[in-house]
Each structure stands twice: as structure tokens, then as C-alpha cells.
Regions:
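Hydrophobic/aromatic beta-strand patches that form the interior of the parallel beta-sheet core
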Residues: 16, 52, 107-109, 178-180, ...
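C-terminal catalytic-base region of ester-bond hydrolases, centering on the histidine
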Residues: 172-273
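Serine-dependent carboxylesterase/thioesterase catalytic core
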Residues: 51, 63-167, 211
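Glycine-rich His-Gly loop
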Residues: 19-21, 85-86, 113, 182
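Short amphipathic alpha-helices and their capping/turn segments at secondary-structure boundaries
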Residues: 1-10, 97-100
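Active-site catalytic motif of lipid deacylating hydrolases and related acyltransferases
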Residues: 8-78, 139
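Short aromatic-enriched loop/helix-cap "lid" or pocket-rim segments at secondary-structure transitions
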Residues: 28-30, 119-124, 129, 188-194
Length: 273
């Protein structure tokens, strides 16, 4: 199947992209050659499809941003496909549990999202001075506040996931959900190498395979379709040598169980009398 098949299948949908923590900062570096989900958005719009980034202060609390995602879904003119990375996936998931939001969604593709939290967030918030500094920076830059990082801790996420377990199971039975994780074993380039030390630390701490920020086990929702690939925490959303974020997204969109449109009916030509 080709890009033409994707155009035909999703012509009436709106794609909503939810960025991760500090995503608006990364997106702002596009003029200096940094890609963060923009190549995926541009590919979709290049196919003539409706694709938009949800405007979120990414350091804000998950619940606050979930309301913003829900509003974006409700404002869409038709059916929606949610594509989210990292913290953005937590907000998309929470939005889908709100009244009438899931009913408008035909798919949720979650890329490297810490549904069960991140040990790195635990470590950062365990240092009071660093926690206060992060909170102040977030407030001064308009990105949110320190609560957004606190929402990524393993304790906070475990509590939230347990409280919403039945709702999540019902959601996955209703909406096609794909969760993608990556694991960093041998960094292929300097971008993945940035996460190498964190990855080794998490393995030594007993967290298992991970992408440098999120353990594989944290990124996979029970009952959803699972995909595990190689790479660091931005490997699936950043175009670079050896990376193919568009190819990853293309593959997952083609696998969403959405009926393809029927081909045009043939024109019957009766023989002349």
C-alpha cells in the first residue's frame, strides 16, 4: 500500500499531534535544523490531509493539557486520529477518557509515552534545588509549572493508571490503540548517545530495556497493539540519518483497522439495440 492509500483512507480525518515535555521548545528550533514531529506533520499535509499540532504548554499538569486536547478533538470537523509523543501521550489518553471524546476518535498512536512514569522524573524531583529551578524556568517561559514534571513520576502515574484501569480497558476495546516503545542498546548516532548514560543507569537500577527516559514496560498499554523498535527517546519523532519517523508513522497508519473507501462502481454500458 502506498501514500495514495493513506490519503484515500484518511481524507475525512483530522490528525492531532500532541508534543512531549518541552516540545514547543524543540519545535521552535526548526529554523536551525532540529526536527520534532514536524517532518511527520509536513508529510501528512503534503498528502493533502488535515494535520495540526495541538497547542499545549507542555510543562503544565497532565489534567490541564488533557482538557485542551479534548477541546481540540471536539472542535475537529470530522473524525480524529491522535498521534502523541512522550508526555503528550499521557494527555491524549486522559482526554480520551472524557465524555464523547473517544467516540470522535478512530485511532490513537502513542510514541514512547511513559504511561507508568519515568525513573528519570523520580530522580530529578528527588533533588529539591533542581525541582525548584525547573518550576521557575517553566513559569518564566510560559511552559507551565513544575506539576507537569511531577505528573511523570512513577508513583503519580501508577496511582493514575490504577484509578482509571477499567476506563482504559474500555477505551482500548472501543478505539484502536497502538503503543510504540524503543530500547537503546548500542547508540547509532550522537543523538541517541545523549541518552546512553541515562539508559545504562536505568538498566542498572532494574528498570529493564528503555530509551534513555522511558522504560519499554512503561510505554506499552495492556490490551493495545505493541511495537518495540531500536533507538533513543526521540528516535521515532526526529528525522536524521538512520531514522525514519515518516516510515514509522506510515506503517502504523496502514495497520489501523479503519475500512478503506470502496473503489468507484464500474459504469455499466449496455449494448446498443
Amino acid at each position: 500500500m502506498s501514500d495514495a492509500a493513506i490519503t484515500a483512507r484518511f481524507a475525512s480525518h483530522r490528525f492531532l499531534l500532541c508534543l512531549g515535555l518541552l516540545g514547543e521548545v524543540m519545535a521552535g528550533l526548526k529554523p536551525v535544523g532540529v526536527d520534532y514531529m514536524d517532518s511527520q506533520r509536513a508529510w501528512l499535509t503534503g498528502l493533502g490531509l488535515d494535520a495540526q499540532v495541538v497547542s499545549l504548554p507542555t510543562a503544565a499538569p497532565v489534567a490541564a493539557n488533557a482538557r485542551r486536547v479534548a477541546e481540540a478533538v471536539r472542535a475537529a470537523p470530522g473524525r480524529v486520529i491522535l498521534i502523541a509523543h512522550s508526555k503528550g501521550g499521557l494527555e491524549a489518553l486522559a482526554a480520551l477518557l472524557r465524555d464523547d471524546v473517544a467516540a470522535r476518535c478512530d485511532g490513537f498512536i502513542a510514541l514512547q509515552c511513559p504511561f507508568q512514569g519515568s525513573p528519570v522524573a523520580d530522580a530529578l524531583l528527588g533533588r529539591q534545588q533542581l525541582r525548584l529551578a525547573l518550576d521557575q524556568v517553566a513559569r518564566l517561559t510560559g511552559l507551565g509549572n513544575g506539576r507537569g514534571l511531577m505528573d511523570l513520576t512513577t508513583a503519580t502515574r501508577h496511582d493514575w493508571m490504577m484509578r482509571h484501569r477499567a476506563e482504559i480497558e474500555a477505551l482500548i476495546a472501543q478505539v484502536p490503540v497502538t503503543t510504540l516503545a524503543t530500547q537503546l542498546d548500542n547508540p547509532a548516532d550522537w543523538r541517541d548517545g545523549f541518552y546512553a548514560a541515562l539508559s545504562r543507569w536505568m538498566v542498572e537500577a532494574g528498570e529493564g530495556p528503555n530509551d534513555g527516559l522511558v522504560p519499554v514496560a512503561s510505554a506499552l498499554l495492556p490490551g493495545a497493539r505493541h511495537v518495540v523498535l531500536a533507538g533513543g527517546h526521540r528516535a521515532l519523532v526526529t528525522a536524521a540519518p538512520g531514522r525514519d519517523p515518516i516510515g514509522v508513522l506510515r506503517d502504523q497508519l496502514l495497520l489501523l483497522p479503519i475500512p478503506s473507501p470502496l473503489p468507484p462502481a464500474p459504469i455499466l454500458r449496455l449494448p446498443s439495440p
